[in-house]
Structures are given as C-alpha cells and as structure tokens.
A protein has these predicted regions:
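Conserved helicase motor core of SF1/SF2 NTP-dependent helicases
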Residues: 11, 17, 25-313
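A substrate-engagement module of RecA-like helicase motors
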Residues: 1-15
Length: 313
C-alpha cells in the first residue's frame, strides 16, 4: 500500500511537470513509466555516448536539440575495446560529420578577452566575440602578471615528473609546490576566496598530491585557509568556470612525452574555464615537443606572458 501511494505521488508530480530533467541514461528509468517526450534537449551532448543519447530519443522524440562543443572533450570511455568500437564518439559529432546544419553561439560571456584570444583563434576559427569587456574582468591581485592588461601567464618549472605508487598515473612535486604558492598568494591578497579558484591538472595522481598539499598546508575543510578550493582533473572541469584557473600540466621529461595532454580538446577545456585570470604551470621544453602546445607557448612568448619571475627563490 505504501508503494502504491508513493507511486501515485510520483505520477502526480510527473503529470503536472512541463519539463523533466534527468541524465540521458536516467531518462530510461522505470519511474517515468511509459511517458513520451516529444521535445528532447540534451546538454553537454558531446560528452554523451551514442547509445546513452538514444535513451531519451526513443521516448517519442519528434524535436531533438543537441547542445555541446565537439572541440572539447568527448565521452569518457575506459575500455580500449569500447573505444575501438566507436563508443568514444558522440551522436553530436556524428551528425556534424554527416553534414547536418549547425548553429554556433558566437558570443562568449565568461572569459576576459585576452583569455579568449588564443582558443578563439586556434579552435574556433576566429568566430568568437566577447560579450564582456576588460573592465568587467579585472586581473586578480596576488599574482605578478607579466602584463596586467592580459591576465594570462605561463610559469616555467624544471622539476621532473614521477609515477605514482601503482605506476598508473603521473605527478610532479615541483609543479605542485609552485601551484600551492600561487594559490596561497592569490588568497592572501584578499581579492578572491577559495571557491573562486580552480586548480586543474590532467592526472589523478597530481590531483591527490595537490589535494594533500593544500589540506596539510592550510586545510580544505570549513574554516581552513583553502576552504572552497577545488582541485580536479581537466575532465572534471568541463562545463564549469572559476574566476581564476591554475593549470598544472605535470609532464616534464627529457623525451618530450606528454601522453594524452597532446589532445587539443583537453587543452581547449583547460584554458577556457577562467573568467579573470589563467595561470599555466609547466615545463616548456617538454610541452614544446607537441605542435598544439608549441603554438600556445609561441603565442605566450610573443605577447610577453612568460612568468619567469614566479616560483624562483
């Protein structure tokens, strides 16, 4: 009897709802019964695999809107076999490849114009326009920006990368220490709070190392010096934004190997999360072995954005 009453309540809510929100796979849950949805809108559609995108579509969809960016990260696929079978490709990307007409939103309201400058030219064919001006995105205090009119910087660090205990991920102690110092100074200036800063890195071992560093060096819990600070992987920041992003690249080796950091979509995500300031931390000699990273570093050097003075001494 309790289950019947509960289902009646759920049915009442669903029957009165004009919009039902769920994940793609969640739209197939039995709680929705046989309900049909003639209009389906899938947000972050480029991160959904084709099978998961089909789940809401088969519920009577007559009008489908896919919203996403195929120049950013694709669906996360752990299995190599699944990736080889095509599960790493989204329905969004397939339809674009088939020539389906698209509508691009060309005005961005997140980034300081200088942060937008490189990804706009490199990844979006110069089509992006700014819906905010420089005065609305003042450079944060607490960091010595090489050019205060352009709150973008690359901080060179020499220390080598290392494998974690399981040998499955990579970390870099020197880059972690420099990143810690940058965040500490940004917060000390009083212009930002912990939740305004995002620390981004491509490797889970570096996420763990830096989380421990911030926890032990001031505390991430409520009342701690770094409360509100988020340390996440690049994949964990897609679709999100912060006032300042500090991107710790990790890779540093004499062979010039950068692994999946060479994925231009991963770089695009990392450098487009920041509103007021973007700080990159890394080993330029290693990163320069990759064409996409070489392009970004050349751009930064040409504009005088290399922060050689940070993290020294």
């Amino acid at each position: 009897e309790m289950q019947r009453l509960e289902q009646q309540m759920v049915d009442g809510v669903l029957d009165d709802a004009e919009v039902v929100c769920s994940t793609t796979v969640g739209s197939g849950h039995r709680i929705l019964g046989a309900r049909r949805f003639p209009i389906v809108l899938v947000d972050e559609a480029t991160q959904a695999s084709e099978p998961s995108s089909l789940v809401p579509i088969v519920r009577g969809c007559r009008h489908l809107v896919l919203v996403g960016d195929h120049r950013q990260l694709p669906p996360t696929v752990i299995s190599d076999r699944a990736a080889e079978g095509g599960l790493g490709r989204s329905l969004f990307e397939r339809l674009i490849d088939l020539g389906l007409p698209t509508h691009m939103l060309t005005t961005q309201y997140r980034m300081h114009p200088s942060i937008r400058e490189y990804p706009g030219a490199r990844f979006y064919d110069g089509l992006l326009e700014d819906g905010c001006d420089r005065a609305e995105r003042p450079p944060p205090a607490g960091f010595l920006w090489p050019d205060w009119d352009r709150p973008v910087a690359f901080v060179p660090v020499d220390g080598e990368e290392e494998l974690d205990a399981e040998g499955a991920s990579k970390a870099n102690r020197d880059q972690a220490a420099v990143t810690f110092g940058i965040v500490r100074e940004l917060l000390a200036a009083g212009d930002l709070e912990g939740q305004d800063i995002g620390v981004v890195t491509p490797y889970t071992a570096q996420v763990r190392m830096m989380t421990d560093l911030f926890d032990e060096g001031g505390g991430l819990d409520e009342g701690g010096q770094f409360h509100g600070l988020e340390v996440r992987s690049v994949d964990g920041y897609q679709g999100r934004e912060k006032e300042v992003i500090v991107f710790c690249t990790v890779r540093s080796n004499p062979r010039g190997e950068i692994g999946f950091l060479s994925d231009r979509r991963r770089l695009n995500v990392a450098i487009t999360r920041a509103r007021r300031g973007l700080v990159m931390v890394g080993h330029p000699q290693t990163l320069r072995r990759d064409g996409t990273w070489r392009g970004w570093l050349d751009w930064a050097e040409e504009l005088g954005l290399m922060a050689w003075h940070v993290g020294r001494g």
